[in-house]
């Protein structure tokens, strides 16, 4: 026969196991909700910029310049306000995405999957200009979050290009 202490012990173990299972389930649900929130936040921002960035891309992509002075002559805020606005809007977008990735609000792989190529293309095209812009205007680091984002996405890009 099973004594009363054994029955009570089994009851306590079952209750404790139930609580533990409930806590684990809750933690897993919270992680899933966090991923969903990240995706939702990213898509809200992406959708806000989608039309503008898509239109701007058609004008910014063919921009050609040799150094800071040449850029300012062709696309500067005084000579070509529309070109300047479009070029700068890309920086605002990549700075925003980089900030969210750095703060852990959005996973870098999510940004990469949706527009990693755009970030790579823009930063490689724009970095020399923005570095010189910072030098000439006394700003030590003009686009820290864009550069951070670029550095986070490049290993993913390289892995994809090498078939990894």
Predicted regions and their residues:
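Structural motif
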Residues: 2-5, 16
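Amphipathic alpha-helical "stem/stalk" segments
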Residues: 3, 9, 28, 32-164
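N-terminal signal-anchor transmembrane alpha helix of single-pass membrane proteins
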Residues: 10-32
């Amino acid at each position: 026969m099973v004594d009363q202490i054994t029955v009570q012990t089994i009851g306590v173990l079952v209750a404790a196991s139930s609580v533990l299972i409930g806590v684990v389930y809750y933690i897993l649900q919270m992680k899933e909700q966090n991923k969903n929130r990240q995706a939702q936040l990213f898509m809200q921002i992406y959708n806000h910029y989608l039309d503008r960035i898509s239109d701007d891309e058609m004008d910014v992509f063919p921009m050609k310049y040799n150094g800071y002075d040449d850029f300012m002559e062709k696309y500067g805020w005084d000579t070509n306000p529309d070109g300047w606005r479009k070029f700068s809007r890309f920086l605002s977008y990549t700075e925003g995405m980089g900030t969210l990735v750095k703060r852990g609000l959005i996973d870098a792989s999510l940004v990469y999957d949706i527009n990693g190529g755009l970030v790579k293309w823009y930063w490689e095209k724009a970095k020399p200009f923005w570095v010189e812009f910072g030098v000439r205007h006394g700003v030590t680091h003009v686009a820290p979050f864009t550069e951070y984002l670029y550095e986070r996405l490049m290993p993913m890009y390289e892995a994809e290009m090498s078939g990894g």
